[in-house]
Design a protein with these regions (language model features):
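Single conserved hydrophobic/aromatic residue that forms the stacking wall/gate
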Residues: 1-9
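Short, basic/aromatic-enriched C-terminal tail that caps enzymatic domains
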Residues: 143-159
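A short acidic, often aromatic-flanked loop/helix-cap motif at beta-alpha or helix-coil junctions
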Residues: 6, 19-20, 151-156
Length: 159
């Protein structure tokens, strides 16, 4: 991936581990602000984290709950693909990533996105991430955490 500049904004794509052709996430920044979008992530890598560091706002995949995935109606091969290293990011891993960024970066807003309809629920994704934040001694009052709607546009966020 290569970067591109538009006016004062720079868009920097970064590679992600997913079973698709050239998948990528994006970091968008200017001199004052940075945001990142990262979905369809099979597993979190140091390279992805480096791209996310410095972001004030992050839209991060929180695709599935491990226990719900085990019990959902998906066939075994699809469950294995989703939970595999080139599949999707679990709620727990999303929470661990947000915890790290909250402690080591400028993150103040995180939106959980790309939730599965079959193996996740918005309330469960949210609570799992909050539980991870608390387990990692993060101040939950220092982050604006929300879950993106599957069907509707989100609210306007001003940086």
């Amino acid at each position: 991936p290569s970067s591109a500049a538009s006016d004062v904004y720079k868009r920097q794509p970064f590679s992600i581990p997913h079973d698709a052709a050239n998948p990528c996430g994006f970091t968008i920044n200017n001199e004052k602000h940075q945001l990142s979008i990262a979905t369809d992530i099979g597993h979190m890598t140091n390279d992805i984290v480096k791209h996310l560091e410095g972001s004030e706002l992050l839209l991060l995949e929180s695709n599935y709950d491990t226990e719900v995935l085990k019990c959902c109606k998906y066939p075994f091969h699809l469950k294995a693909r989703i939970a595999g290293s080139t599949g999707h990011l679990s709620n727990t891993m999303s929470g661990k990533t947000i915890s790290y960024l909250l402690k080591n970066s400028n993150l103040n807003t995180a939106i959980l996105g790309h939730l599965s309809k079959e193996s996740n629920f918005p309330e469960l994704a949210y609570q799992t991430v909050v539980d991870e934040l608390l387990a990692n001694n993060c101040n939950t009052d220092s982050i604006n955490l929300s879950v993106a709607s599957r069907e509707l546009p989100g609210r306007l966020i001003k940086l």
